[in-house]
């Protein structure tokens, strides 16, 4: 049996471009792709913090060091430049490998520079 687990996450990235007439996808700075262990053409989920939109597309490379997050094609109607988004990908993991599996979590500052990388999410505590 397999479980679907979070594999990669880029947290609170700022959308830098929205290109409606570009072939559909999301262009992501290659530095961020590498840090989050995301591959070109890999399916990604995008969750827009500003408006609550959630959609699925695929990752393409943006110039390394550019800090670009470009939402393209029809998905460009679901984001605006400056919106904060969470970009995530999932993996099918065999049950026997679940205990040793950990995601690549990348946290960025407002200009999409990496500020922290982790492999765990803290337990949410009650108030």
From Swiss-Prot:
Q: Give, as in the UniProt entry, the pathway in which the protein acts.
A: Cofactor biosynthesis; (R)-pantothenate biosynthesis; beta-alanine from L-aspartate: step 1/1
Binding, substrate: 57, 73-75
Q: Name one Pfam family in it.
A: Asp_decarbox
- State the Gene Ontology BP annotations: alanine biosynthetic process; pantothenate biosynthetic process
The protein's matches in InterPro entries, at most eight in alphabetical order, are given as: Asp_de-COase-like_dom_sf, Asp_decarbox
EC number(s) given by UniProt: 4.1.1.11
SUPFAM superfamilies in the record, alphabetically?
A: ADC-like (SSF50692)
Keyword DNA repair in the entry? The reply is: no
What does the note accompanying the cofactor annotation read? Answer: Binds 1 pyruvoyl group covalently per subunit.
Single GO term (MF): aspartate 1-decarboxylase activity
Which keywords, in A-to-Z order, does the entry hold?
Answer: Autocatalytic cleavage, Cytoplasm, Decarboxylase, Lyase, Pantothenate biosynthesis, Pyruvate, Schiff base, Zymogen
The reply to whether Transcription figures as a keyword in the UniProt entry is: no
Modified-residue entries (Pyruvic acid (Ser)), positions? 25
Q: Which domain of life is it from?
A: Bacteria
Q: How this protein is processed and modified after translation, per its record?
A: Is synthesized initially as an inactive proenzyme, which is activated by self-cleavage at a specific serine bond to produce a beta-subunit with a hydroxyl group at its C-terminus and an alpha-subunit with a pyruvoyl group at its N-terminus.
User: Which is a Gene Ontology cellular component entry for this protein?
Assistant: cytosol
Reaction(s) this enzyme catalyzes, per UniProt? L-aspartate + H(+) = beta-alanine + CO2
- Provide the top EC class: lyase
Q: Which residues form the active site?
A: 25, 58
Q: Sum up the protein's function in the record's words.
A: Catalyzes the pyruvoyl-dependent decarboxylation of aspartate to produce beta-alanine.
- Family, as annotated: Belongs to the PanD family.
Q: How does it assemble?
A: Heterooctamer of four alpha and four beta subunits.
Recorded protein name is Aspartate 1-decarboxylase
Protein source organism: Polaromonas naphthalenivorans (strain CJ2)
Taxonomic lineage of the native organism: Bacteria, Pseudomonadati, Pseudomonadota, Betaproteobacteria, Burkholderiales
Q: Supply the gene name.
A: panD
